[in-house]
C-alpha cells in the first residue's frame, strides 16, 4: 500500500509537465482507490484465515459469505466420527505448572489436528483435553471408515510418543483414549443469530464418545463401534478386511444407550512389521479385556 502511494506521488511529480491537473488528479485518485481495495482485500483475507483457525475452512467460508440467521443450517450425511482425549490429564495438571500443562495440551491438539487433516478428516471441536473429528463431513472423504482408522493409528503412535514422562512426578502416565464409529448425523450451525455454534448431532457421535470413555475399563486404547465395523464389511469369522485386522471384544451396554452394542478394536495398532508392534502386542496381553460376563 505504501508502495502504491509512493508510486502515485512519483508519477505525479514526473508528469507535472506532461499531464493536465485534472488528469493528474484522476490518476492519483485511481491509484489510491486501487491501494484501498488491496488493503480491504488483505484485511478480509486475514479475517477469513483467523476464522478458519477456529472453525473448519468450509464453515469459515460460509460464515463469511452469509448474513447472520436464526435458522438451522445443517444437513444429514453419512460420516465417521473420531474422538480422542488425554487420560490422566486432570491429575497431571495438579502436579505441573499451568505453563507445562498448556504446552502439553497445545502439542497434543496441534499434532492430532495435523494428522487428522493429512488423512482427509477435519477437526470439528476441541474442548478440555479432548477433540472430535469428522471424516466425510464438510470435506468429502469416500473411504471415511478406513481413513479414520488410519488417522487414529497415526495419532496413537505419534502423539503417544510426544507425551511427557510422568515417572518423576510419581503419578500414572498420560495416555490416549480413542473412540470411532460410523453412521448418519446432522452437521451444521445451530442457535440464535447473535450466538451460533457449528457442531454435529446424532447417535454416532454419542457412540464414539462412549467408546472413548470405555477405553480405560477395557484396557484397549482404541475402540471401534458396530457402524464402522459394518461399513468395513466385518463378518463373524472374517475379521480381516482391507488389511485392517479387527478384533471383536463382545457386547457392551454403553452409557446412554438402551441396547448393547458390539465393540471392536484393532489387533495391531501399528502398521504390520513396525518395530514397536511387538511392544503393543505385549501391552495388550498384559491388560486383559473386561469380565467375561460382558463378552458375546
Show where each model-derived region lies:
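A generic structural signal for short hydrophobic patches within well-formed alpha-helices
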Residues: 60, 89, 228-229
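Regulatory cytosolic signal-relay segments
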Residues: 15-77, 103
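Catalytic NTP-binding/metal-coordinating core of nucleotidyl cyclase/transferase enzymes
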Residues: 71-150, 198
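Cytosolic regulatory/linker segments at or just downstream of nucleotide-handling modules
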Residues: 185, 215-296
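Hydrophobic transmembrane alpha-helices
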Residues: 1-16
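Amphipathic alpha-helical transducer elements in NTP-driven molecular machines
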Residues: 204-208
Amino acid at each position: 500500500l505504501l508502495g502504491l502511494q509512493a508510486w502515485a506521488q512519483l508519477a505525479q511529480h514526473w508528469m507535472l509537465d506532461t499531464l493536465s491537473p485534472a488528469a493528474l488528479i484522476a490518476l492519483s485518485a485511481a491509484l489510491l482507490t486501487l491501494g484501498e481495495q488491496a488493503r480491504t482485500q488483505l484485511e478480509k483475507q486475514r479475517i477469513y484465515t483467523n476464522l478458519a483457525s477456529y472453525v473448519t475452512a468450509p464453515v469459515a467460508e460460509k460464515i463469511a459469505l452469509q448474513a447472520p440467521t436464526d435458522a438451522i443450517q445443517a444437513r444429514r450425511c453419512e460420516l465417521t466420527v473420531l474422538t480422542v482425549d488425554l487420560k490422566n490429564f486432570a491429575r497431571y495438571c495438579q502436579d505441573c505448572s499451568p505453563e507445562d500443562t498448556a504446552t502439553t495440551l497445545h502439542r497434543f491438539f496441534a499434532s492430532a489436528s495435523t494428522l487428522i487433516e493429512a488423512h482427509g478428516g477435519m477437526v470439528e471441536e476441541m474442548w478440555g483435553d479432548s477433540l472430535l473429528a469428522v471424516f466425510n463431513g464438510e470435506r468429502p472423504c469416500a473411504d471415511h471408515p478406513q481413513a479414520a482408522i488410519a488417522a487414529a493409528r497415526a495419532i496413537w503412535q505419534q502423539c503417544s510418543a510426544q507425551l511427557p514422562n510422568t515417572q518423576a512426578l510419581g503419578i500414572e502416565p498420560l495416555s490416549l483414549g480413542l473412540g470411532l464409529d460410523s453412521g448418519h448425523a446432522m452437521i451444521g450451525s445451530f442457535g440464535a443469530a447473535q450466538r451460533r455454534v457449528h457442531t454435529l448431532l446424532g447417535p454416532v457421535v454419542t457412540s464414539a464418545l462412549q467408546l472413548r470413555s470405555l477405553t480405560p475399563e477395557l484396557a484397549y486404547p482404541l475402540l471401534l463401534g458396530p457402524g464402522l465395523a459394518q461399513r468395513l464389511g466385518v463378518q463373524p469369522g472374517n475379521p480381516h478386511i482391507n488389511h485392517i485386522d479387527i478384533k471383536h471384544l463382545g457386547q457392551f451396554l454403553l452409557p446412554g444407550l438402551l441396547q448393547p452394542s458390539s465393540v471392536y478394536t484393532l489387533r495391531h495398532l501399528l502398521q504390520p512389521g513396525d518395530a514397536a508392534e511387538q511392544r503393543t502386542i505385549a501391552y495388550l496381553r498384559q491388560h486383559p479385556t473386561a469380565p467375561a460376563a460382558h463378552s458375546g
